Amino acid sequence: MGHRKHSQPRRGSLAYLPRGRAKSMEARIRTWPDVKAEQPKLLGYAGFKAACMRIASIDDREKTPNFGKQLVGLGTVVVTPPMSIIGIRGYSKDRYGIDSTFDVYAKDLPKELSRLFKTKPDEKAIENAEKSLAQIDELYAIAAVLPRKAGLEQKKPYVFEVAVKGGDIAKQFAFLKDLLGKEVKIDQVFQRGVEVDVAAITKGKGIEGPITRWGVKKKQHKSRKSVRALGTLGPISPATIMYSVPRAGQRGFHQRTQ
């Protein structure tokens, strides 16, 4: 390879570090949008990837090279079975952070939930929760999705929290109280044509080398000892390998949001 006048940009992005396995098959939502609305609404839904497809469309963006031409892209089909609202959780904030104050569960839970946990029916749970609404800062719906309703053979359900925004705490609790023990469909959460953020876990690939994992360049075919390896691990000082050096490790099974 000839001499370069300028150095080449690094191969592989550092924006997704650490590239480790996700802790769960369920995506973790750390921040929910702040919706300014008079009526409360759920902000999330769950689905399963069903298939991939090709989408042919006409480019309607003006001042682009492909304006008026046909574009072919990839699309993903997501099946969204009904989501059961099995509980309500209230959080309160203090100087140390956010803590769970109460949990209210529906009386008749799906039998598949016994694979995860068991709850005792508490008739006064709703009354006690209503009395403590003054110290509640956030309310979440405890939702469950049964894979069998999506045509999957998995018996273990997925249980997660969905944020509720809009109105005050009293309106949000009344909204969740009305949905408790019922099923919610996706058209009750999202409208047709809206843009949403999708968080999911990618397909796991196992342990991969630096060539595949980071996309670094291979060495010449007659190089000593190795070809699909790095030429250097860094400078002699400091006497450590920096985190930015591409190394072998886990590839896939990461959480990504689009």
Indicate residue ranges for each PLM-predicted region.
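Extended basic (Lys/Arg/His-rich) segments that typically form rRNA-contacting surfaces
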Residues: 1-258
